[in-house]
Curated annotation (Swiss-Prot):
Record field: catalytic activity: L-seryl-[protein] + ATP = O-phospho-L-seryl-[protein] + ADP + H(+); L-threonyl-[protein] + ATP = O-phospho-L-threonyl-[protein] + ADP + H(+)
Bias (Polar residues): 406-433
Region (Disordered): 384-433
CDD domains: STKc_Pat1_like (cd13993)
Gene Ontology MF, one: ATP binding
Entry function: Probable serine/threonine protein kinase involved in the G1-S transition.
Any one biological process term the GO annotation gives: G1/S transition of mitotic cell cycle
Enzyme Commission no: 2.7.11.1
Pfam families attached to this UniProt entry: Pkinase (PF00069)
Subcellular compartments: Cytoplasm
Domain Protein kinase: 12-337
Lineage: Eukaryota, Fungi, Dikarya, Ascomycota, Saccharomycotina
Name of this chain's protein: Serine/threonine-protein kinase VHS1
């Protein structure tokens, strides 16, 4: 891994590399003007669209090294201070399908911008364009849900905390669906956490605006990918698991719902039920399609939780419960496991439920909806923490503070599959005048981008 010590991109000083994927690198950076931390994702300027996130580690590493070398050359030739233009975010947000044919790597950014106003979706602050890559400046958060579940055992002793985090994820995803965007890669690595255990959805690299997706089109990460996207022949093995012949397309939103079911198992049981929802490759999943009760044999599920999962993990996507129904049932459920701390979980009051699922932060009317931007700041975190009934608040904090970092209740372990990805989209204008403005903005942006590429072509060789 190449370290870019004392290297700057405009006013952002790179302090460390915190992630890598098939099409980009993620750095932690300090804004030297405000002394605030950000995450900067460096995305290669053009790549073939790969819909499956599970690219081999060797290929991911090879692509990362290639980009690192280009960045090293860029920093060297600019004496460690790269000055690049900031692209108008509104222009990117309103890019069309035709625009993406010219600049395919902007699809992910555009979709993300359309929903990043939700309080539980990572904010994009700037998009910077160089001849080597596009830099996306976003919120920085100290950890992700995978680390919190597996390494810190953070949720298995506190049912209220499970509800809080899961409902925030559902709220963010529901907001995306309402805006015609389907994430298609919901997994713990794409869910970040602040110091107050608020969760933030990120990485829209595989997202689509297509309401329906054809069966057997692999989009997502294997552990969380619904069966209809892996291997589907138009038949379902058992009527118990909701089986009947599917049509030629499957609802995109219901694929995200399946992923949420696996996430909820992760939060409560610290494991995945199977490695892949493919009858030919995974025996556990095969037996599940024959008899869904197998879940109660391999996981410590309460009857109520099993009943809920049976409505989510329907093999036929058209038979899955709605996201709104899922949110309501999670709010009212009184047990997740058949023993231990999660065997008794109080239902949420209406006010607390609404606070968790609200798309904006209503804890302080003087603060903007996205005041979560600086939640890594402990003072800001205290000012922005939610309020609830004393009993519920004490219940959440008790599970965080009382175990001094030592948490019990593990029933297995999750396997990691990380990566950065790529994407889809479309848009429309409400008037000819609006379309003209967007077209003019994009033309100027495209011209500037081409000038940058031509003047610095040696950097990409």
């Amino acid at each position: 891994m190449m370290m870019f010590h004392n290297c700057r991109i405009n006013n952002y000083l790179i302090t460390s590399q915190i992630g890598e994927g098939a099409y980009g690198l993620v750095y932690r950076a300090l804004d030297i003007r405000t002394d605030r931390q950000y995450a900067i994702k460096a995305v290669v300027q053009s790549y073939g669209v790969s819909k499956e996130a599970d690219m081999g580690n060797d290929k991911i590493h090879k692509n990362s090294v290639k980009l690192q070398k280009k960045l090293a050359k860029l920093f060297k030739e600019s004496k460690n201070v790269v000055r690049v233009p900031s692209i108008d975010l509104e222009s990117i947000e309103n890019m069309s399908e035709e625009d993406f044919k010219k600049l395919p790597h902007y699809k992910e950014i555009s979709l993300h911008l359309r929903v990043h106003h939700h309080k539980n979706i990572v904010t994009i602050h700037e998009v910077l364009q160089s001849a080597v890559c596009t830099f996306i400046v976003m919120d920085y958060y100290p950890t992700d849900l995978f680390t919190s579940i597996v390494d810190n055992r953070h949720f298995v002793t506190n049912g209220l905390l499970v509800k809080k985090v899961f409902l925030q994820i559902c709220s963010a995803l529901n907001y995306c669906h309402e805006h015609g965007i389907y994430h298609c890669d919901i997994k713990p690595e794409n869910l970040l956490l602040d110091t107050e255990d608020n969760v933030f959805l990120c990485d829209f690299g595989l997202s689509t605006t297509s309401t329906y997706i054809k069966p057997n089109v692999c989009i997502g990460s294997s552990y969380y990918m619904p069966p209809e996207r892996i291997s589907f022949d138009g038949r379902v093995s058992s009527s118990k698991s909701g089986g009947h012949k599917l049509g030629k397309v499957c609802p995109s939103c219901n694929g995200d719902l399946w992923s949420l079911g696996i996430i909820l198992i992760n939060l409560t049981c610290i494991r995945n039920p199977w490695l892949k929802a493919d009858k030919t490759e995974d025996n556990t999943y095969y037996y599940f399609t024959k008899d869904p009760n197998i879940l109660k044999q391999i996981l410590p599920l309460s009857d109520d939780f099993y009943s809920l999962l049976s409505k989510i993990l329907q093999v036929n996507p058209k038979n899955r419960m709605s996201l709104q129904e899922l949110m309501k049932e999670v709010s009212s459920i009184t047990s997740f496991t058949n023993e231990g701390p999660l065997s008794k979980v109080p239902p949420l009051s209406k006010s607390v439920y609404e606070k968790f699922v609200s798309p904006v932060d209503n804890t302080n009317e003087n603060l903007s909806p996205k005041s979560y931007v600086y939640m890594h700041d402990s003072k800001a975190a205290k000012n922005l923490s939610y309020t609830s009934s004393s009993e519920e608040e004490d219940g959440i904090k008790e599970g965080i503070d009382d175990d001094n970092g030592s948490r019990s209740g593990s029933f297995g372990t999750l396997d990691t599959d990380t990566g950065l990805h790529s994407s889809f989209t479309s848009t429309s204008c409400e008037s000819d005048n609006e379309c003209s403005k967007i077209s003019n903005k994009f033309s100027l942006f495209e011209k500037k981008f081409n000038e940058l590429r031509m003047s610095s072509s040696s950097l990409t060789n």
